[in-house]
From Swiss-Prot:
Name recorded for this polypeptide: TATA-box-binding protein
Sequence repeat spans: 145-221, 235-312
Organism: Bos taurus (Bovine)
Function: General transcription factor that functions at the core of the DNA-binding multiprotein factor TFIID. Binding of TFIID to the TATA box is the initial transcriptional step of the pre-initiation complex (PIC), playing a role in the activation of eukaryotic genes transcribed by RNA polymerase II. Component of a BRF2-containing transcription factor complex that regulates transcription mediated by RNA polymerase III. Component of the transcription factor SL1/TIF-IB complex, which is involved in the assembly of the PIC (pre-initiation complex) during RNA polymerase I-dependent transcription.
Comp. bias regions, Low complexity: 107-118, 126-136
Description of how the protein assembles with itself and partners: Binds DNA as monomer. Belongs to the TFIID complex together with the TBP-associated factors (TAFs). Part of a TFIID-containing RNA polymerase II pre-initiation complex that is composed of TBP and at least GTF2A1, GTF2A2, GTF2E1, GTF2E2, GTF2F1, GTF2H2, GTF2H3, GTF2H4, GTF2H5, GTF2B, TCEA1, ERCC2, ERCC3, TAF1, TAF2, TAF3, TAF4, TAF5, TAF6, TAF7, TAF8, TAF9, TAF10, TAF11, TAF12 and TAF13. Component of the transcription factor SL1/TIF-IB complex, composed of TBP and at least TAF1A, TAF1B, TAF1C and TAF1D. Association of TBP to form either TFIID or SL1/TIF-IB appears to be mutually exclusive.
Family note: Belongs to the TBP family.
Cellular component, GO, one term: transcription factor TFIID complex
Keyword Transmembrane helix attributed: no
Length: 319
């Protein structure tokens, strides 16, 4: 019998030269590296995948934060530009004119989520306006003149000691004040007479009374032997007052019109409002009393009150 046929069936493939290369039966030799002929399988590391996903997520968050910061900067720049233009209009007025009156006008800006508004309450910018209706039509209040200050030149040098000794109702103390203080009863006024010949008359309630009183003082000086004249009579200041009949929130008024007003209750109980046109100074009290001073003519007193009355109504105190 043949030798190949005597081998068992499981060893027949090993005896033949082709059997050594039979697929499905791997042969390992000492000269062949371990793993030769094997198909490598890809290995996936779950830890490396999670790290990549975390990095991508952080990059996306950083991009979103940068976009939000850019939007905030753009909106802040736009609001700053609006605020600057508003302040320029408040100081210059329309078409380069000086504003006559100012009141509060809220500027609405939509803040970004999570940000604080740029305008803290109650600070609001100011824009010039003109009242739509005169105060005389809506209130019927007419300021009353309380004092008129006028000046006149007597045109000669005066001996104040002689005037004080010979004239009635006259006093002179050069250590305290270098002028003769003279008073008359009708109209009830007071005059300050200086040695240069200048005279100041105060206390009159009207323009006619002020002129009449100044002429009476000049006549007294003439009777004392001085060549007094009546030159350059001029009204220097008029003071008026009125009552609006309702209390006023002075704190809100000074915050809204802080460019033109000052309020120090520890020093003076009234709010001082300096109007630009007409150039009048107003003393506003919480009780509703208003004093107007600095006018040269009566019409300026009335015009200033017409301008301020609508503002005072806006700050009426509710009880």
């Amino acid at each position: 019998m043949d030798q190949n046929n005597s081998l068992p069936p499981y060893a027949q493939g090993l005896a033949s030269p082709q059997g050594a290369m039979t697929p499905g039966i791997p042969i390992f030799s000492p000269m062949m590296p371990y793993g030769t002929g094997l198909t490598p399988q890809p290995i996936q590391n779950t830890n490396s995948l999670s790290i990549l996903e975390e990095q991508q997520r952080q990059q996306q968050q950083q991009q979103q934060q940068q976009q939000q910061q850019q939007q905030q900067q753009q909106q802040q720049a736009a609001v700053a530009a609006v605020q600057q233009s508003t302040s320029q209009q408040a100081t210059q007025g329309p078409s380069g004119q000086t504003p006559q009156l100012f009141h509060s006008q809220t500027l609405t800006t939509a803040p970004l989520p999570g940000t604080t508004p740029l305008y803290p309450s109650p600070m609001t910018p100011m824009t010039p306006i003109t009242p739509a209706t005169p105060a005389s039509e809506s209130s019927g209040i007419v300021p009353q003149l309380q004092n008129i200050v006028s000046t006149v030149n007597l045109g000669c040098k005066l001996d104040l000691k002689t005037i004080a000794l010979r004239a009635r109702n006259a006093e002179y103390n050069p250590k305290r004040f270098a002028a003769v203080i003279m008073r008359i009863r009708e109209p009830r006024t007071t005059a300050l007479i200086f040695s240069s010949g200048k005279m100041v008359c105060t206390g009159a309630k009207s323009e006619e009374q002020s002129r009449l009183a100044a002429r009476k003082y000049a006549r007294v000086v003439q009777k004392l032997g001085f060549p007094a004249k009546f030159l350059d009579f001029k009204i220097q200041n008029m003071v008026g007052s009125c009552d609006v009949k309702f209390p006023i929130r002075l704190e809100g008024l000074v915050l809204t019109h802080q460019q033109f007003s000052s309020y120090e209750p520890e020093l003076f109980p009234g709010l001082i409002y300096r109007m630009i046109k007409p150039r009048i100074v107003l003393l506003i009290f919480v009780s509703g009393k208003v004093v107007l001073t600095g006018a040269k003519v009566r019409a300026e007193i009335y015009e200033a009150f017409e301008n301020i009355y609508p503002i005072l109504k806006g700050f009426r105190k509710t009880t």
